[in-house]
């Protein structure tokens, strides 16, 4: 059955960025699904360096972002549009018409989500989705309880996610939007390849449940076991109790460390 491959090393963001660069070089007009938050910033820094110093060409690359807060104007410094411009798009030669975002100020969120889903289907599927993981195992804004067949939709953020994101809003939880637009788990799973980055001790429990646990709605990232080409890039803290290996979700949630599992040695 499909399984999650784990690559544990000191600089997982760099290794992940180089994998994305391989995809861009082999398919110049590739479609990338992109994540935001503090975790992927080093990935974008390395991609920008590869563009600046080694000529990595983004001129034909198309991108879709995972999610966007509901109710924040595009000029707000906490929108994910602003984030991507600050950390990647302004530093590479990507064309504005090739980047795609959900509109958090749309008058009809359901229609906006349907538009985005159809746009992704027309241009995609994504060659790579870059993901982070929340402390509660969420991917994008697919919080615990999100169904496996979920599509792009409006979601209500859990209190734990609001608490975690308050640091981006001056530690004022009242300023964190309570809703967001997010691609669904089924949308993510249609990508040809999924790369998830997790760093720090605070992500250890979520990584462990995702890699070694069963596929369950209470840990949305666990559904990634069903994808044929999914790799977790983790540092030593986040991956302390998992190995550089290929892990399969079963009723017993076993983890195999044999070379026949195509272990990803860092």
From Swiss-Prot:
Residue positions of the active site: 67 (proton acceptor), 136 (for ring-opening step), 138 (proton acceptor), 143 (for ring-opening step)
UniProt keyword list: Carbohydrate metabolism, Cytoplasm, Hydrolase
Subcellular location: Cytoplasm
Pfam family, one: Glucosamine_iso
EC number: 3.5.99.6
Family: Belongs to the glucosamine/galactosamine-6-phosphate isomerase family.
Assembly notes: Homohexamer.
Name of the protein: Glucosamine-6-phosphate deaminase 1
Taxonomic path: Eukaryota, Metamonada, Diplomonadida, Hexamitidae, Giardiinae
Annotated gene: GPI1
């Amino acid at each position: 059955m499909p399984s999650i491959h784990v690559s544990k090393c000191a600089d997982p963001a760099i290794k992940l960025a180089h994998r994305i660069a391989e995809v861009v070089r082999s398919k110049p007009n590739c479609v990338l699904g992109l994540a935001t938050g503090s975790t992927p910033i080093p990935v974008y820094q390395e991609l920008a360096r590869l563009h600046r110093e080694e000529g990595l060409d983004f001129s034909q690359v198309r991108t879709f972002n995972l999610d966007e807060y509901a109710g924040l104007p595009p000029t707000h410094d906490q929108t994910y549009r602003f984030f991507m411009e600050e950390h990647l798009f302004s530093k590479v030669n990507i064309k504005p018409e090739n980047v795609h975002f959900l509109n958090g100020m749309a008058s009809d969120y359901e229609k906006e989500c349907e538009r985005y889903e159809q746009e992704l289907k027309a241009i995609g599927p994504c060659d790579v989705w870059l993901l982070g993981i929340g402390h509660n195992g969420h991917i994008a804004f697919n919080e615990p309880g999100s169904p496996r067949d979920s599509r792009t939709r409006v979601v209500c953020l859990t209190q734990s996610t609001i608490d975690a994101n308050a640091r981006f809003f001056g530690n004022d939880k009242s300023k964190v939007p309570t809703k967001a637009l997010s691609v669904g788990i089924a949308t993510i799973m249609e990508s040809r390849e999924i790369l998830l980055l997790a760093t720090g001790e605070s992500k250890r429990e979520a990584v462990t449940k995702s890699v070694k646990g069963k596929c369950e709605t209470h840990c949305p990232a666990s559904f990634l076991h069903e994808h044929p080409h999914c790799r977790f890039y983790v540092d030593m803290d986040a991956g302390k109790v998992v190995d550089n290996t290929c892990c399969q979700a079963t009723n017993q949630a076993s983890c195999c460390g044999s070379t026949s599992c195509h272990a990803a040695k860092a």
